[in-house]
Amino acid sequence: MKELLKKVTEGQNLTREEAAKAMDMMLEGTASPVLVSAFLTALRMKGETVDEIVGCTEMMKSKGGSVKLDTDEYIDFVGTGGDGANSFNISTTSMFVCAAAGVTVAKHGNRAASSKSGASDLLEALGANIMLEPKQVEQCINETGMGFMNAMKFHKAMKNVGPIRKEIGIRTIFNMLGPLSNPSNASRQVIGVFSPEKVSVFAKVMSEMGVKRAMIVCGSDGMDEITVTGKTLVNEIIDGKIVVYEIDPHDYGIEYADASDITGGDGKENAEIAKSIFNGEKSARRDIIVLNSAAGIYIGGKADSYKEAVEIAKQTIDSGNVMDKVNEFAAETKKLN
């Protein structure tokens, strides 16, 4: 690890094989916490390359559990985090809207690492059992159309890295690896990233890893979501081709909002925000859920265009059925415990 650390601190890029080797040492706990934190920080300062991300992702996936579904018509819906926006859990909240609209969701997530609340924190606050085994997740998806794969359960080697990430408290390559290492190998994904420069990097990585349909997004405010404070950069993957465009809320009848309008808190606070949206609240928080849910509905194949998906998202929320989906999911996960 010292040799690889030296190379990175000198500004040199690692090969795919070297990156995989570094990831192996971090996950297995053969590198000391001091070396791991130094390596993660140095890699972030240098800037992670496509080869480094692919190498680390492949090693991480090789050590994790897996979920096998009978179809590939399902999505993962996740943000990298690390954007410093302190927003509520937008992608996790949006997954319930997608599921209520008929999209099968196999979501991969974790507890908060560089924010107050991660996907696990919100789902737990909504009453779900977040510690299902692979077979139980498969059953949950078959029964409810959605499932949650806890990174700490599926990537058990992460136990050696989790405390280090929490202690240094900054965005690292692990923020990128989570969305890329879905145990179900989802070929349809909506991924929010923390930097406009990383949008094209993610698109290249995902294309190389065989993702068929995806939207990789970053707001003009740096949010790892489709934002309501301005426009959002999108790289859409369509069968290996990458199409670049922007999403402007104004084009869908949605007014710009301030960042303060979409801030969140811990898991319990964010659960209350989600419930308010699902129970009919009209606000910037609802608007951002509409825009992000639409991405999942579109990539999940339930709409022929993003514009059509926005209308479906609005109708789904207004129907009142999303809260039923939350309760159904929570009950099923508890039954499987």
Show where each model-derived region lies.
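N-terminal basic/disordered segments at the start of proteins
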Residues: 1-13, 20-22, 77-83
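A general structural signal for well-ordered alpha-helical segments in protein cores
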Residues: 1-2, 19, 36, 53, ...
